[in-house]
A protein has these predicted regions:
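Alpha-helical membrane segments of multi-pass proteins
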Residues: 19-325
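Short, Lys/Arg-enriched N-terminal segments with co-localized hydrophobic residues
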Residues: 3-23
Length: 325
């Protein structure tokens, strides 16, 4: 399977180099609002303003609130910027037109953004967030490691069943609700691994590594279904009527009606089946890179702590047995 993924990756690179710029140019016909979502941009700016006010100006009002490191600030800002780009920028619009863009959006939204946001929050702020009743209830129920693991991967897999995918993609209400639930489940899935609070640790370091391996295995069937399918699976990207209905979720109705488009093939992108397989490969590769990075991070942190523990527990020799310099 690794060889197949690498082969597909090479083909993706060639297609992107040859045709990748052309679709982005064509997206301008949908207008600035559809491409950059000013409302969502305003929301993300407000989140960043609130974050910097809390860790800066108002930090002195919070007991035991320490200064937030530049690294943590970088993590949080990067997470918010990526969240905007995949949900408010051109990637979101392109994800309604071609499946590979949709899977790029999914990969970043659920495997990259949540860990960055969690790593960007200081301990003293996290302690107050988890005291919120709703958050506390979620962590005590579906936030348990095994439940969170199964919940996220089940929701992700169910979402990409063709019958569910097409129904959700074309629903004004179902689409944002399902994606919001999936995002919360992603945060809960990452919590047992990246939670820095000593009083809320539920997994040892070695169990965290096993947890991430299990995550990768559980996500594989959904990606494999997409990668190895011999026919296009989703009507949203093949049936003009279904595609047009899905496009209504992100493009103003008057703009869409004035364009007189017949389907997603107006972009001149790669064949639908190739695009679908490419999407599965992109999701799997990004997931493997992120999960592998986190496993490495957890392992080396564990090894460093063990060395420090051994050093601190080493017996101190009496003066007459110590080697003189």
């Amino acid at each position: 399977m690794i060889n197949l993924l690498l082969c597909k990756l090479r083909r993706v690179s060639v297609f992107f180099i040859m045709k990748g710029v052309y679709p982005m140019n064509n997206l301008w016909i949908f207008g600035f609002e559809a491409l950059w979502s000013p409302i969502f941009l305003s929301m993300m700016i407000l989140v960043l303003v609130a974050y910097f006010l809390i860790i800066g100006k108002y930090r002195s009002y919070i007991p035991h609130a320490e200064k937030v490191s530049k690294k943590q600030q970088f993590y949080f800002v990067t997470g918010i910027v990526l969240l905007y780009l995949v949900k408010g920028g051109p990637i979101d619009l392109l994800g309604h037109i071609i499946f590979s863009a949709h899977m790029t959006e999914m990969a970043i939204l659920y495997t990259v953004v949540p860990p960055l946001l969690l790593l960007g929050l200081p301990n003293w702020l996290l302690e107050r967030v988890i005291q919120v009743r709703v958050v506390r209830l979620l962590l005590s129920t579906v936030g348990k490691p095994l439940v969170a693991l199964l919940l996220f991967n089940a929701l992700f897999s169910i979402y990409h069943l063709p019958v569910v995918f097409d129904a959700v993609k074309q629903s004004y209400i179902g689409h944002p609700i399902f994606l919001a639930i999936l995002f919360v489940s992603a945060l809960l899935m990452w919590w047992p691994v990246l939670n820095p609070l000593p009083d809320h640790q539920t997994l040892s370091e070695i169990k965290k590594i096993g947890y991430m391996f299990a995550n990768g295995m559980l996500l594989t069937p959904a990606c494999a279904l997409i990668i190895f399918a011999s026919t296009p699976l989703f009507a949203t990207y093949t049936d003009p009527q279904s595609w047009m209905k899905a496009m209504e979720l992100c493009v103003p109705a008057d703009t869409l009606s004035s364009l007189q488009l017949t389907g997603p093939d107006f972009l001149g992108w790669i064949p639908v089946l190739e695009d679908q397989q490419t999407g599965g490969v992109i999701m799997k590769i990004i997931q493997e890179i992120v999960y592998g990075t986190v496993i490495g991070y957890v392992f080396f942190r564990w090894a460093r702590r063990e060395r420090e523990k051994e050093k601190n527990e080493a017996p101190v020799l009496p003066p007459y047995l110590q080697t003189k310099p």
